């Protein structure tokens, strides 16, 4: 999972 801010 990759956070939106990354």
From Swiss-Prot:
The modification Methionine amide is found at residue 6. It is found in: Secreted. One of its GO terms (biological process) is defense response. Expressed by the skin glands. Disulfide bonds: none annotated. Keywords: Amidation, Amphibian defense peptide, Secreted. GO terms for cellular component: extracellular region. It comes from the Eukaryota. This is Electrin-1.
């Amino acid at each position: 999972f990759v956070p939106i801010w990354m």
